[in-house]
């Protein structure tokens, strides 16, 4: 069989697509919203998405909270804010999606703060 030589970018894109489909199917089966974390060097975002209805239920970010950057302390504030918004809408259990980022630093700080505020994932 002929070996296909993919570039790293193509491999990463294929892996991301597989993970997206896997998380989407997991959410559809569990009827739980997905907490999606997106980060850049400057800021961090968190969205609560329901794939059943294709809508965003709640969102929070370091930009929305008028924070200067997305460091660990501000990531904790975003985590607490998204947890409060999710609990206000009646969602206690969510599926955590870190968009392929490593679970450390700002991602971990946001996740821990959301757990402490009452979310389960």
Swiss-Prot record:
Keywords: Ribonucleoprotein, Ribosomal protein, RNA-binding, rRNA-binding. GO terms for cellular component: cytosolic large ribosomal subunit. GO terms for molecular function: 5S rRNA binding; structural constituent of ribosome. It comes from the Bacteria. InterPro entries: Ribosomal_uL18_bac-type, Ribosomal_uL18_bac/euk. The keyword Ribonucleoprotein applies. Signal peptide: none annotated. It holds the Pfam family Ribosomal_L18p. Belongs to the universal ribosomal protein uL18 family. PANTHER family: 39S RIBOSOMAL PROTEIN L18, MITOCHONDRIAL (PTHR12899), LARGE RIBOSOMAL SUBUNIT PROTEIN UL18M (PTHR12899:SF3). This is one of the proteins that bind and probably mediate the attachment of the 5S RNA into the large ribosomal subunit, where it forms part of the central protuberance. Part of the 50S ribosomal subunit; part of the 5S rRNA/L5/L18/L25 subcomplex. Contacts the 5S and 23S rRNAs. This is Large ribosomal subunit protein uL18. The lineage of its organism: Bacteria, Bacillati, Mycoplasmatota, Mycoplasmoidales, Mycoplasmoidaceae. The gene is rplR.
């Amino acid at each position: 069989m002929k070996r296909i030589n993919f570039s790293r970018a193509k491999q990463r894109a294929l892996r991301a697509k597989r993970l997206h489909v896997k998380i989407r199917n997991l959410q559809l089966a569990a009827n739980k919203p997905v907490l999606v974390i997106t980060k850049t060097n400057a800021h961090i975002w968190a969205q609560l998405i329901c794939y059943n209805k294709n809508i965003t239920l709640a969102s929070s970010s370091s930009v929305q909270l008028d924070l200067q950057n997305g460091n660990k302390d501000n990531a904790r504030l975003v985590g607490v804010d998204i947890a409060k918004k999710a609990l206000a809408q009646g969602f206690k259990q969510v599926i955590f999606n870190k968009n392929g980022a490593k679970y450390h630093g700002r991602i971990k700080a946001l996740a821990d703060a959301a757990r402490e505020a009452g979310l389960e994932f």
